[in-house]
Amino acid sequence: MSYHGSVCVNDGQGLSIDPDRREDIAAHTLLAAYDLLEKWSTDEYAARAEFMNELEGYWNALPGSVRGQAAFEIDGRDRLISAYGDRQGKQSAWYFADRGVRPQEFDLTKLQSLRALYIHLDQLPGIPAHPHQLTHDFLDEVRAALSSHQLALWNELLNPSKNARKTNVLLVSVPRQAGGRSLIGVAFAARDREIDRHVPVFPLTARRRMASHMRERGGASLELMAKRVAVLGCGAVGSVVADTLAAAGVGKLILIDAEEYSEDNVFRHVLQPIYIGFPKTIALKHQLERRYPGLAVEAFNITAQRWLASTPLKGIDGVVVAFGAPSVERSFGRAFRSQEHELPVVFTWLEALDLGGHSVLMWAHRPGCLDCLYRDDEGAPCLHPRTSFLEPNQHVTRNLTGCAGVFVPYGALQARKTGHMAAEQMLGALVGSSTARAYRYWVGDGTQAQAQGLRTTPWWSRAPSTSTTVATDQAFGRPCKRCRGNS
């Protein structure tokens, strides 16, 4: 039940109603509210526990309540923190952070810096019930419940007010039976180291801007927070891979690409146009770290060959290679197999136009490598992969500005589908659900390719009706001297 008496009988998740049965809907809602109130009236302990589960919503409805944003961990560790507030402007702004920390996502330039105290209590006293409002009595009751350590922090909070009136903030967390902690607060004035009762108090609540909370609430894996993944090649496909890994919860990314972001890629790259002319890795670091709280990105504006030659792979949990250059990718596949460190490597590339995309997972020291794909039906080495959708020796590149502007035609949809597929394959390897070689692909309808007279392989026709298990066996089924010691 809210401060104003509203009763919530359903959270709305999965609720389906027939809008033509209005009387039945009203009757059902009223009966549900009655049953809920009757239930809590007979069990005071359970009612109190349920109320504390919903404390933040109740507090937010108190008269004069202001909602701020918290960037510190609500971990039950009593401490002095910092508050930044402005209740006089057109829109009230309040932020809370640990001392010495100025979160980059908050604009604090025009806000007053205030002293604040965060404490944790097992029970919250003095909660006002309608029609009563929050008063200084609440602070008195909280103060009476403080431990000796908390009381010392309280005195330290008020100490600067000995010479002038100061605005202070008290934030209190209490346990929720449903898990976690509720956080509420109050802003008040102090003078001569005492609460100034001439200045009204007002309630505070806070949106949680901590990386841990937003990750868990937003569906990002906390298990992946410690994982470190390198993405080699940050073009249209590689940038989608990086963005998807970050959104899934991977906490550390290493981005390697020597090129600048070009206006030619605006419609198929995750970067915004404001980054045109900047190194792609630097721009992605800037954009992704601001997009995904808690993410740490290492950006290398160098060639992948140079990076690999100077960087030990120990400490890296996975690598995604998104060059779209088969010869270069094969050389990297061999380089990874020569390393002592075992790790999963995903190679991903696009076919021209709307034919489809591919993603291959290999492990550095296990059977199955990129060279396995470069075998003909007899098992002999060949120049083109068995997985190709396009027959070899066809001209598919275009250029609009001369030789320097040559590109392979494909669109944003194709790049995103391929990038998501490769990222999903890497995520499976990181969490242990994919522990062996694997080949994944998607097949487009080929309308554009056929309109341009391009010839497709028999595999492109068979692929839609072939399971990924069978496709993986076919892709890696030929003898390979690189990964299995025979030819």
Where are these regions (language model features)?
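Compact alpha/beta protein-protein interaction domains typified by the UBC
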Residues: M1-N10, D24
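Ser/Thr/Pro-rich, low-complexity mucin-like regions
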Residues: T29-A46
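Glycine-rich phosphate/adenylate-binding loop
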Residues: R48-D192, K314-G318, A322-S487
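N-terminal charged helix/coil linker that caps or initiates catalytic domains
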Residues: A178-V229
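Glycine-rich adenosine-cofactor-binding loop
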Residues: G218-E260
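Glycine-rich phosphate-binding loop and adjoining beta1-alpha1-beta2 segment
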Residues: A258-P293
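S-adenosyl-L-methionine
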Residues: R290-L308
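Short amphipathic alpha-helix with an adjacent loop that forms part of the alpha/beta core around
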Residues: W307-G315
